[in-house]
Amino acid sequence: MITSPNLPPEMQREMLRRMLTIRRFEERASADYLAGKIYGVVHCYIGEEAVATGVCSALGTGDRIISTHRGHGHCIAKGADLNRMMAELYGRQTGYCKGKGGSMHIADFEIGMLGANGIVAGGISIITGAGLAAQMEGKGGVAVSFFGDGASNAGPFHECLNIAATWKLPMLYICENNMYAANTAAAATHALSDVAARAAGYGIPGVIVDGNDVFAVYQAANAAVERARSGGGPTLIECKTYRWRGHTERRGQADSRDRAEVEAWQRKDPIALIERRLRDQGELDDGALQGMEGDIMAALEAAVAFAEASPFPLPEHATDDVFAA
């Protein structure tokens, strides 16, 4: 059962569109990676689309986020350009980082996407600094840290929650608990079953939501955003979810997880849940869904064509853009 939303129908349909865009982008990225067209490594966000979409739907254009190694969904949910994203995955000059960052290091400061980070928990400190900057700016901005259950065991998580709570920084800490850090089950490394319980140690709210229910995620994030904007300080939100794919997209990669567990979570598909809700409300039919899918696939084909037509970075530019000035 998905949460009953009190949102305009057009906003609900936009949430579905974002989630479908993330799913189709990831499917194409995986296929192109396995075909040898994308370099480096790809971590798919399939199954977790409701988290990025629900949180980013509660944000304004001036709010800032930071992502993880599994970051394509956050970029798309925050409004990133598909052409530049795909070009970056393809390692082309027209990509967000001129083809030098790849899948794990996409950034677009203009939309408030401060980047993704290949180091587990590496972004938490950076975005907490952005929260301090937002507080000092005094314009009501908030900062959002996305991270996984594995990162919640790292030092930066605890250090940043402590300082954010002490200084009442306008922060949202979003734990995407997909139950595994790479191939290690959270149950094997967490003394408590809920990451959100750790919020009590810092005197801040710890909220648990169904990470497959985009409306529940939105409601929790929206309440936390309102609290942060009003000076109430940070909130830790734990989104219980699941990644459908292995840790990375690799041909022949063994998945240590129980197949029955994977299939059980796939039956709780976050996209199917929101589709069903919109149909029940009379806000979506087959024609509208097919039109939405068609637009998304056309945009992805255009993004791939843009990437393939773009040049690779030149070797003599390898050290360009290392420093800000």
Task: Show the residue positions of the predicted features.
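Conserved thiamine diphosphate
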Residues: 135-139, 191-223, 267-293
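Glycine/aspartate-rich loop-and-adjacent alpha/beta segment that forms the canonical ThDP
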Residues: 227-325
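Charged, compositionally biased N-terminal leader segments and the immediate start
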Residues: 1-14
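A glycine-rich, aromatic-flanked flexible loop/lid motif
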Residues: 167-169, 187-203, 240-252, 267-270
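A short, conserved beta-to-alpha structural element at the edge of catalytic cores
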Residues: 167-187
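N-terminal glycine-rich anion-binding loops that anchor highly charged ligand groups
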Residues: 17-33
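Short gly/pro/ser/thr-enriched loop/turn and capping motifs at secondary-structure boundaries
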Residues: 73, 179-182, 216, 243-245
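Cofactor-binding active-site loop characterized by glycine-rich and histidine/acidic residues
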Residues: 27-30, 37-167, 185-191, 196, ...
